[in-house]
Amino acid sequence: MLSAGIVGLPNVGKSTLFSAITNLQVEIANYPFATIEPNTGIVNVSDERLDKLASLINPEKIVYTTFRFVDIAGLVKGASQGQGLGNQFLANIREVDLICHVVRCFQDKKIVHVNNTIDPVFDFEIIVNELIQADFELITNRIGKLKRKAESGDKIAKEEFVLLEIVLNGLKQGQMPIQTLSESELKTIKSLNLLTAKPILIVANVSENDLLNLDNNEALKKLNAFLDQKKIPKAITVCSLIEKELSGLKLEQRQYFLDELGLKNYSGLNRVIQAAYQTLNLWSFFTFGKKEVRAWTFKKGWNAPQCAGQIHSDFEKGFIKVEVISWDQLFAMKSLQEAKKQGLIRLEGKNYLIKDGDVCNFKFNVT
């Protein structure tokens, strides 16, 4: 299961956001390092398409695809040198697929800021610099070990050696490999679990009042201008305190609560989950039956046998064909029987690239 690590400086609202995302009660305190061991929570990735398909057949079960969030303790300047239990926390980040970086864009005198000032750009750069410093040391050590093999003519060692020197020079200039390397180059160094080779999603934690008029939040404007300059997607805005309140309410109470606050169309938390999913180039295909209607996660660009393997390895090994219809065509037809009558169900082979939203029935044979 793919995962996102929620990181940031102490007291930016990470644990509050994590608690809202996973609906778990984790320790939240107004002092650094309230989180030491990473808390982990599994969340459903909501999907309106799946809900609509389920409404056609009323299955025994609806199974959403899932995503793992890890709440990693607040980092501080000097973490790469072990400050604030930094080495332990950085090791936790190496284990996740995506870094979800929470920055503080709200004013609150009751909640201390580790640097005594609200400056999300400065906060962002502190974390990024710590990631760079940690990777710089790791890569330097790796290059030292590879040098003799690379110089002896070992082709694989030389390829990695040359690439790591490029990455190291980039880090010296503050360039992260996730932004500069190709997908094939990133695969070459994947085993190193570089922090700076992981995709980053920026989440701006704002106040309740800010949500009503984000244009007045100077910290947020400064952050987004900086991200735009660095060619990083704009921050997703959330109010972790509102999200925490919402997570404790029943579904039917949530909209009433938001309406009372004047936030009828607010969906910050859902956008964080969806954005994490999309940042990793993840898509969903569906299986459809009376027993269950289910979403399955796959990487954009996977072929039919690879996607079949998400259900069971035997499906991939013995793949023959797949019956496919797009979810919206099936929903419009109201049933598989009607879709078949209209000739909308296609039979595809092993080279077919599954599309986001395909409804699939895999044919396989294992002897």
Swiss-Prot record:
Instruction: Read off the InterPro entries from this record.
Output: ATPase_YchF/OLA1 (IPR004396), Beta-grasp_dom_sf (IPR012675), G_OBG (IPR031167), GTP-bd (IPR006073), P-loop_NTPase (IPR027417), TGS (IPR004095), TGS-like (IPR012676), TGS-like_dom_sf (IPR023192)
Which Pfam families has this protein been placed in? MMR_HSR1 (PF01926), YchF-GTPase_C (PF06071)
Q: Which UniProt keywords apply?
A: ATP-binding, Magnesium, Metal-binding, Nucleotide-binding
Ranges of residues in domain TGS: 281-364
Binding of ATP: at which residues? 11-16
Obligatory cofactor(s)? Mg(2+)
Q: Does the keyword Zinc-finger apply?
A: no
User: Which stretches are annotated as coiled coil?
Assistant: none
Q: Which GO cellular component terms are attached?
A: cytoplasm
Molecular function (Gene Ontology), one example:
ATP hydrolysis activity
Q: Which CDD domains does the UniProt record give?
A: TGS_YchF_OLA1, YchF
Name the positions where Mg(2+) binds: 15, 35
Task: Pinpoint the OBG-type G domain residues.
Answer: 2-258
Function per UniProt:
ATPase that binds to both the 70S ribosome and the 50S ribosomal subunit in a nucleotide-independent manner.
UniProt family annotation: Belongs to the TRAFAC class OBG-HflX-like GTPase superfamily. OBG GTPase family. YchF/OLA1 subfamily.
Q: What is this protein called?
A: Ribosome-binding ATPase YchF
